[in-house]
């Protein structure tokens, strides 16, 4: 993989400028393929060109600015987080977006997966069918694994203990749904676990030691079995070895969320 391929922002791959589109189409290992929460599966050169054209037009019409949040690039998979700020009917809107890029051994793109909640767009949460199969061998290490076990068990104390003193969880809706510090986190997770724990099917991860992006399927909330729904979260490790941040993407909890 050359340096330009390794460090190319995933956002630019999903929403290219017109002069870059031909080169981007050629950068896929086979035909372009991506999964978008609204468009669904987009596969093939023609479909990808239509998608890219529509998205570029939307970015322009909505006066969108892009705030970089974070990224991690590994040999075969990487992710990027951004926040889109754009003009809404009642003022500025922000939409957190995460993008995962799978690449072949030659650095060419195999698949792109996009995660965001539809709530900031239209006030609705829409369950998204699974994009990936669960990987039974996938195990998260250190504090990320501790958090996942506490989440599955519905253990409020253990979840809160996994965070740094000033750590936070950001819900998919964005900055208006941030729970920072142990007291705020405790209140949030007490409500979240009111019906029990939230075990996830772990499907794929990107972990560079500082951040861990986990793609998963939500299949159960407490005692309630749910239709499998795709989601993604990014966990940032702090200097103290605990979580500095947990940022959630998508509407996997659309059918079960108590808040």
Regions found by a protein language model. Name each.
Residues 53-141, 186-259:
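A beta-strand edge to alpha-helix "cap/lid" segment located at domain peripheries
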